[in-house]
């Protein structure tokens, strides 16, 4: 499987136009929104208001985590020929700081994804009523818990 992925036809085109450019646009636009949005949690202490703020924080943390991931699994491989292997990840999570950063990045990424889906459903008119928004909130919270449990279990499989 690894050999196929390494020598896949049009790999650079797919990586550039299907992964990198959309992710770059999302990251740049997200940083712009995070830096220009007004935080009103002091005045309005509603749950969804806190989710809005956490979405921005999780987005910035996720951006840093994805940059670290791209460096470790793509750029470092291309520039130095280092093999992104099980032992490399085991070495990163062997320290409490590495494990903590990985876990925080993982959880922020999952939160940003699930809360972003909730916002997407409202913005695109899929969940317009308060009841449908509440139901989608429960479903996406369950998805967050499932992804977090699966992701943390996978992460701790690397801990020796």
Predicted segments with their positions:
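Membrane-embedded alpha-helical bundles that constitute the cytochrome b-like, heme-associated redox core
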Residues: 1-160
């Amino acid at each position: 499987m690894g050999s196929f992925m390494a020598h896949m036809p049009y790999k650079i085109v797919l990586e550039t136009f299907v992964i990198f450019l959309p992710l770059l646009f999302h990251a740049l636009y997200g940083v712009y929104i995070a830096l220009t949005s007004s935080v009103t949690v002091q005045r309005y202490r509603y749950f969804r208001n806190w989710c809005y703020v956490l979405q921005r924080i999780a987005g910035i943390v996720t951006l840093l985590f994805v940059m670290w991931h791209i460096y470790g699994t793509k750029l470092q491989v291309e520039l130095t020929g280092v093999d992104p292997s099980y032992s490399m990840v085991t070495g990163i999570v062997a320290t409490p700081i590495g494990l903590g950063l990985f876990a925080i990045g993982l959880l922020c990424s999952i939160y940003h994804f699930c809360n972003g889906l909730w916002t997407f459903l409202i913005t695109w008119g899929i969940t317009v009523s308060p009841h449908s928004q509440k139901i989608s909130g429960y479903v996406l919270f369950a998805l967050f818990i499932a992804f977090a449990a699966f992701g943390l279990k996978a992460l701790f499989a690397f801990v020796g």
